[in-house]
């Protein structure tokens, strides 16, 4: 899949494309409807399937304090887009100047002159151009004989609008199961493993892979979760009994560790029944279900007792996840309860 940063990077010999436009944060099931329609049309007419996304998020340009937390990084968006069959992603730097482009110029410059589009797919709530004056209907009017426009209805399921906002709300409530339902996949974060306080293995007997994220990143509410940890592809050797690209069962703590008075929020993953030196390795942490809320305990002994129960519940939830997703045995490691 090709990735272009800015319109100037798009090859001049791109002669036909089917295009979908949006921020696509999370690449949730609603986004997938747009992407699938774009890929289907591209294959039908022998065109390239192109996704246009914006970075930074448009809201952050005009209302920085109200900018939504990011569900996916650009790199994660790219990987998800490719998995659905997108041939190329154009990343546009969203600026105030760009937002002042008239809808007509927007179509002429982006869709016709740059991407040579024959077809464009947008959601029913799509807006574009100066003061967001362009809508899905006006896009149809502007394009008319120039290219075809497919407007996709927003996705409602079980009375819930599937949107990035909905996903963020589920995460803020700690309801990762519902977030996963809206996403059509496990919510996950990726990043390097860094050194934490060191008490997990030495003091508690539960060594963890620690990750820290910027406060612009969407994370589940503070609590303990069942999930999977996967070491991302690497040429560096992994010391221990874990290997890259295998999902290992993990009990995941999100929060500040109130029992020990920590202040920095982190994601700490205790991998069940495996042990490896993961420092410096990039890992993917997938959240499957909520285990319990974050608590402050009166003693380390009380904490250890509850953590043992967390591990037991994690095994049960992940065994159910394996069955629900019919996971191939070679893709994961989950040891049965002894």
Curated annotation (Swiss-Prot):
Entries under InterPro entries matching the protein: FAD_synthase, Riboflavin_kinase, Riboflavin_kinase_bac, Riboflavin_kinase_bac/euk, Riboflavin_kinase_dom_sf, Rossmann-like_a/b/a_fold
Annotated NCBIfam families: PRK05627.1-3, ribF
Keyword terms of this UniProt record: ATP-binding, FAD, Flavoprotein, FMN, Kinase, Multifunctional enzyme, Nucleotide-binding, Nucleotidyltransferase, Transferase
Protein name, as recorded: Bifunctional riboflavin kinase/FMN adenylyltransferase
PANTHER family: RIBOFLAVIN KINASE (PTHR22749:SF6), RIBOFLAVIN KINASE/FMN ADENYLYLTRANSFERASE (PTHR22749)
Comment on pH dependence: With magnesium ions the highest turnover of riboflavin is observed between pH 6 and 7.5, while that of FAD is between 7.0 and 9.0. With zinc ions a steady increase in riboflavin turnover is observed between pH 4.5 and 10, while FAD is the major product at pH 7.0 and decreases rapidly above pH 8.0.
Its biological purpose: Catalyzes the phosphorylation of riboflavin to FMN followed by the adenylation of FMN to FAD.
Entry keyword ATP-binding: yes
Keyword Nucleotide-binding: yes
Family designation: Belongs to the RibF family.
């Amino acid at each position: 899949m090709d990735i272009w940063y800015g319109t100037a990077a798009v090859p001049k010999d791109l002669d036909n494309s089917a295009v979908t436009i949006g921020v696509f944060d999370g690449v949730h099931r609603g986004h997938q409807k747009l992407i699938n329609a774009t890929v289907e049309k591209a294959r039908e007419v022998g065109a390239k399937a192109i996704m246009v996304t914006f970075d930074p998020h448009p809201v952050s340009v005009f209302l920085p304090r109200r900018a939504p937390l990011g569900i996916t990084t650009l790199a994660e968006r790219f990987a998800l887009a490719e998995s659905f069959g997108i041939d190329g992603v154009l990343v546009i730097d969203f600026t105030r100047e760009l937002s002042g482009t008239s809808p007509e110029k927007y179509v002429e410059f982006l869709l016709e002159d740059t991407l040579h589009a024959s077809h464009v797919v947008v959601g029913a709530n799509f807006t574009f151009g100066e003061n967001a004056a362009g809508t899905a209907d006006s896009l149809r009017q502007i394009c008319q004989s120039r290219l075809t426009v497919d407007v996709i209805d927003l996705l409602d399921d079980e009375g819930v609008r599937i949107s990035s906002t909905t996903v963020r709300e589920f995460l803020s409530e700690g309801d990762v199961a519902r977030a996963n339902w809206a996403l059509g996949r496990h919510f996950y974060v990726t990043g390097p493993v860094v050194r934490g306080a060191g008490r997990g293995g030495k003091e508690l007997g539960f060594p963890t892979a620690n990750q820290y994220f910027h406060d612009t990143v969407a994370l589940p509410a503070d609590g303990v979760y069942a999930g999977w940890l996967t070491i991302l592809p690497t040429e560096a050797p992994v010391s221990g009994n874990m290997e890259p690209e295998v999902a290992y069962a993990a009990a995941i703590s999100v929060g500040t560790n109130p029992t020990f008075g920590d202040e920095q929020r982190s994601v700490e993953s205790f991998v069940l029944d495996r042990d490896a030196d993961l420092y410096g390795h990039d890992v993917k942490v997938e959240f499957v279900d909520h285990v319990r809320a974050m608590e402050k305990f009166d003693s380390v002994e009380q904490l250890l007792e509850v953590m043992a129960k967390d591990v037991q519940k994690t095994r049960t939830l992940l065994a159910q996840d394996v069955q629900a997703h019919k996971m191939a045995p070679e893709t994961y490691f989950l040891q049965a309860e002894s």
